[in-house]
């Protein structure tokens, strides 16, 4: 597929243009056929592009937006009062067909509310969910939901499993992804009513490859392709994982800097340490998909660096290339036709 066009919320996130523009430059250098619609305050975007010597780059088009959704703004306020925000216009571009996907590092609640209002959910899906990948011993696994829904009933968790499974089939070409349901133990007697009901629904669905309960340490074992949980638990687990990765890398750096002997040992171990850093660096896994919408929306971490935001753009490109929305829609329609979804 050529001439992929992505709408970028250039003003969103903790750092805005300071991170977004350099990340976009990195992305177009890796993707010569990629066009980016930079949505935000025109004068500020132009000045930033000029600063980086990219003002005349044909792969960039500036789309003016006069407003910005702040990181602490209520989603309802942003939805009602920020109709000319960079976030809103970027999502509108997807609805209008001018862009095939949208990427934003902005306010998660506002992004979810706005995307749901503008793009609407797919038939059979009550609520969109956030899914992203985590590193494992054997490669990576995906977790859904990561914060879109703090309270989810069994029916919603079942829908998340359907969508997450379809995403993995589309991107990784795995016909039967292994699905695990996050719980406080692997025994059938463990868990609350919500989790037990979800487990029963998944076990009764022969179409999906449900392998049973998984505990928190299974996030990193690589035993399953998809971990299903509600957004409250998923978000806490994600943030804890990011914090642990940063702690580990910091402790290693300090340990090899203690004296001249440890510094020599560090030089000897440098190739292995670089490999470890690449495996654990949270920025390499940045870019969470908002599944269940009539369009591709990718959420970047608000505090992401250049590499992290670039990875979010790459995730959007990957989903466009693999026709993720169409494949998820087809999977959902199959479930509806079989009476597995309403």
From Swiss-Prot:
Localization: Cytoplasm
One protein family per Pfam: FA_synthesis
An annotated GO cellular component: cytoplasm
Enzyme Commission number, as recorded: 2.3.1.274
UniProt-listed InterPro entries: FA_synthesis (IPR003664), Phospholipid_synth_PlsX-like (IPR012281)
GO molecular function: phosphate:acyl-[acyl carrier protein] acyltransferase activity
Cleaved signal peptide residues: none
Reactions it catalyzes: a fatty acyl-[ACP] + phosphate = an acyl phosphate + holo-[ACP]
One GO-annotated biological process of the protein: fatty acid biosynthetic process
Pathway: Lipid metabolism; phospholipid metabolism
Enzyme class: transferase
Alphabetically ordered keywords of this record: Cytoplasm, Lipid biosynthesis, Lipid metabolism, Phospholipid biosynthesis, Phospholipid metabolism, Transferase
Function: Catalyzes the reversible formation of acyl-phosphate (acyl-PO(4)) from acyl-[acyl-carrier-protein] (acyl-ACP). This enzyme utilizes acyl-ACP as fatty acyl donor, but not acyl-CoA.
Family statement: Belongs to the PlsX family.
Quaternary organization: Homodimer. Probably interacts with PlsY.
Record-given protein name: Phosphate acyltransferase
Species of provenance: Legionella pneumophila subsp. pneumophila (strain Philadelphia 1 / ATCC 33152 / DSM 7513)
Lineage: Bacteria, Pseudomonadati, Pseudomonadota, Gammaproteobacteria, Legionellales
Recorded name of the encoding gene: plsX
